[in-house]
């Protein structure tokens, strides 16, 4: 049996509110009392199960919110009016008995019971839009988070007339990615509106309020970009949102270093944009401190802390000390570590910096212990001079560069402690020097080597250099430089090499060449005072217009003929296939007028000892190799020279094919090697038309044809010698070449030939016939 429910009157609700002790607490007690009444009128099993279970989360939320503070007396009446306007009477709300469907919403000083009935409105196109939420009296919509998944929810701006179904032009789509494990709600409200019922895009705000009372503020969304709720020009402040037991911390602050431009062409660049490896700063951190002295010059230094515990490196400091009159300045410049970068600004306002240079305008350097020492530059306007003293115990090479102070420096860094107009003399002992046109420079050195290069700029804009070398000299006094302008002195290691230049006519000019150990301590110092043309090979450029252009072109020999030059030789295999071409010498001399080549006698020791004739075996000159144990004989000087290159290992012929570079002693070897790259096969077999790269391979192949060839002939007269008239007889004196061993019908070693297929001329042409030398006297007659 279920007992009828007992309605709760308005007076009882007011009494509960007053007796609760707090306005907010009255709501919580009223909800608890209503729940107890519902449990009492239920059946026994349902009541027992309800007592064992915990209260709903919505009831706990109402009990927690009731402890915030008491509402004002006027708020109670306002609550009733809002509840009545919402169409949800208190009695009806209590009579429903379903607390899970009830929703509470309110301002900081009031609470509202919102209806769970969805709101249906019409848009401009006439379509019905259903909002699954509850509307408050202030025009706000309360939407449960569990209904936001995979749904498009549109909120209407305040000021629009929702009664007649009109919707403003701006629609806001709620982000569907918001998820929650409990019944948390998202409240979307609008803080400003325009006169025409739309949203003021400049002042409107969308406020998303989770259950943890932490806010996410975002500016209004332009109509053209509905998907993006955060415009680029707005500011977003994220304090932290707790959803489902997870926390999202605040936005991390990102600090970006950008180049900052200052007056005077000065730019501060972030340290992460500088390649530390190229500056020699890898593995160490550097802190740079910049300051400006009394003369307006930037003074920069760094204290480098190396990551490795190296006891030899120490940090130096720059301690500018400016007195009251701003006349004297002491500068301490680090010189021990290359990672400490002195940075200054010259007269043109250009920031200067160098890593591998010992740079100072005035100071004292001790190379015996460079770690942790300082360069001190006392400046006085009364003396108007700078003192420089260089003391070293080891041979060092320094580069003294003197250049005009008005020109910007690009090779070295200048640490300026005073204005350039106050520098008029440089000395080592420290006495005052009167102002004069010439500058006297004195360097006190222990035995070592110094290279001094003075650079001056003429009024026409040309830069001239003067080179001075100091080797093992204790004192070099009164070095005069003809330049009256103020100079800046820089000591840097020498790392340059000056080569001689070839003039247009092919003459070599003498230019001092200095190879120093500025940054190569393992090499010795080499000084060349002058250069002559003896033993120097000139390699002019590729410009064809230059009169000194020299080109050497290697002419490839004719593949069908042997060209025996001064760098050619033949081996025994090549001599078997040697073909000598006989040409008319008189006709050759007519074509080669003015191109006579002088023959050079053989310079081998055997030919020199024999008076330039070599060993004469009969009428033929022989050249014998003078290497002990060899004794090879050659008939030409070029063959002997090629043979001697084989003994010495010289291989002047180089293959110019890509990625090859093989070297050969003879030119024919190089030519044969080139065929392996090109694939050329120029030797053709006359029988089967096969092609070969080398002639010896072809000769071996032809022998296979000769061994397999069998010639059958029935009756053939191969050759016949008939006696003719007397004028056909050969009468000569000397050696005559005749045919021998010719028999009728056959040739010795070949066999018979069928003359029906080939003629006698073809047989004699294509057949190897043995030759015999016969000597005939002048009075003999031979048939």
From Swiss-Prot:
Span of zinc fingers (C2H2-type): 623-647, 653-677, 683-705
Give start-end positions of Gly residues composition bias. 19-28
Quick one: where is this thing mainly located? nucleus
Region spans: Transactivation domain (Gln-rich): 140-239, 352-501
- Listed Pfam families: zf-C2H2
Q: Which SUPFAM superfamilies match?
A: beta-beta-alpha zinc fingers
Presence of keyword Ubl conjugation:
yes
Q: Where is the composition biased (Low complexity)?
A: 29-51
The record describes the protein's role as: Transcriptional factor that can act as an activator or repressor depending on isoform and/or post-translational modifications. Binds to GT and GC boxes promoter elements. Competes with SP1 for the GC-box promoters. Weak activator of transcription but can activate a number of genes involved in different processes such as cell-cycle regulation, hormone-induction and house-keeping.
Bias regions of kind Basic and acidic residues — which residues? 1-12, 310-319
Briefly state the modifications made to the protein after translation: Acetylated by histone acetyltransferase p300, deacetylated by HDACs. Acetylation/deacetylation states regulate transcriptional activity. Acetylation appears to activate transcription. Alternate sumoylation and acetylation at Lys-553 also control transcriptional activity.
Its recorded name reads Transcription factor Sp3
Question: What residues does the Glycyl lysine isopeptide (Lys-Gly) (interchain with G-Cter in SUMO) crosslink join?
Answer: 122, 553
| Location in chain, cross-link Glycyl lysine isopeptide (Lys-Gly) (interchain with G-Cter in SUMO1) | 553
Kindly list the places in or outside the cell where this protein is found, as annotated in its UniProt entry.
Nucleus; Nucleus, PML body
